[in-house]
Amino acid sequence: MMNFTKLKNRMHNQLVIDKRLKVVCLWYLLFLMISVRKHSLRAAADFSGLATSQFSRFLKNHTDVAVYNLNQLSKKQAKQFCPVLKSLAKGQLPWKVAILIDSTIEHRSSLHTDNVKRFNHGKGFVIGHQWTNVVLIINDKLIPLTPIPFYTKSYCREHNLKYQTENALVVQYIDQLNLQDYIGAHDPKQVVVLADSGYDDRKIQKAIIKKNGILSLP
């Protein structure tokens, strides 16, 4: 079993980040790994002994750090598993690589929360944040890729952003995704994209076909 100090040191060595930000980043990641009723900045401060303002400034001013580190770690992990690509599900499926696309809705944490929307979530309506998770599966190992954030129309107006629908964002993501950065040279026909019926969109299908991939919906 790995003790706390070893865990911290291991995580510390994986992060490509300015030295002065590493302490805040590390404590925030550790805080997100524990099970608590509410992952708030105040709770993160209580857990770490740092000031709430340190976490607030870190999240507000360094959003690119998380994206960059996730990209680097995903590529590093993928390259460890890709030298010998095996068929998925221990050889029971014809493909060797799978990309999973699935949306997640996080319930709002308070009445006054930015970028929340009322979503139809199958069994009723949910008010919260939405983003789209993208996961790569190689040799039955799950590797998270950068998720796709969704911004509401009101949030886009307030922050001078161009509003895009969730499906339009998925199309853009697929167009820009270069699998070769993760698994090197490969046969696109060995890649399957798995998504739920909410992504049964002609533009998404065309984006996947353009990459020579295969789309599978329930």
Predicted regions and their residues:
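Short, charged/polar micro-motifs that form catalytic or ligand-binding hotspots
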Residues: 31-34, 45, 121, 160, ...
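Short, conserved catalytic/metal-binding motifs centered on acidic residues
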Residues: 44, 95-109, 134, 190-200, ...
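Electropositive, glycine- and tryptophan-enriched low-complexity nucleic-acid-binding patches
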Residues: 56-58, 121-186
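Short helix-terminating capping/connector loops at secondary-structure junctions
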Residues: 91-94, 183-189
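A short acidic (Asp/Glu
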Residues: 109-112, 201-208
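Short, structured coil segments at secondary-structure junctions
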Residues: 211-212
